[in-house]
Amino acid sequence: MAGHSKWANIKHKKEKMDAKKGRIFTKLTKDIIKAAKEGGGDPETNSKLKLAIERAKAFNLPSENIQRAIKRGTGELGGAKLEEVIYEGYGPAGTAIIVEALTDNKNRTAGEIRHIFDRNGGTLGAAGSVTWMFDKVGVIVVEKTDSINEEDLMMVAIEAGAEDFSADEGEFEIITDPSNFQEVREAIEKAGYKISEAEITMLPKNTIKLSPEDYEKFEKLIDKLEDNDDVQNVYHNVELEDE
């Protein structure tokens, strides 16, 4: 059950993206709109919405913005209709990249994403070209403390349906199937553990290490993609360097 953490190899990219406060509010708002549109405006019965709200609060998105986003999602407020679009492509040295976007104009976004790939050593691919290299999973992270017994936490996670458990430097990582992500998360919280991160994500089945030259090109491409206002998430299979 215990193993090496793939999440640790890719998450500092996420942290870097999250630090861009100027754009993160827009992305958080779109996440809430999408979740409310798909599952209704009650976070108690809509786990995706609950997760989106919690993440928004962690970044201090004002409550009125959260409520307005929920109402846009449920149709109580007007506004442009948002659609989720997935793009797949290749970066420098054949790296695999998946881009999740929420947009009110698919033609505009497709053109912008294609332009970013073309100008930064990448190629936009067809649907299904790289998704087979990834697994869609739930990731739950619990920070290590002196009071936590690793075996006890692992048993709680396993009994709730977790698929994998690993101990990394300073934290425990629990991997779940997306279908029982919320169930495992609630079991861990009920047992008294404090969760530091929890989300549905795409983890690469294998990661690759790039040469310094290719890595620099790859990082520039990822930064450009993440800077696009319509882009919500960018996933890849590159082993990241420490910053």
Curated annotation (Swiss-Prot):
GO molecular function, one term: DNA binding
Subcellular location: Cytoplasm
Keywords: Cytoplasm, DNA-binding, Transcription, Transcription regulation
Origin superkingdom: Bacteria
Homology family: Belongs to the TACO1 family.
Source species: Caldanaerobacter subterraneus subsp. tengcongensis (strain DSM 15242 / JCM 11007 / NBRC 100824 / MB4)
GO biological process: regulation of DNA-templated transcription
Presence of the UniProt keyword Transmembrane in the record: no
GO CC, alphabetical: cytosol
Protein name (Swiss-Prot/TrEMBL): Probable transcriptional regulatory protein TTE1135
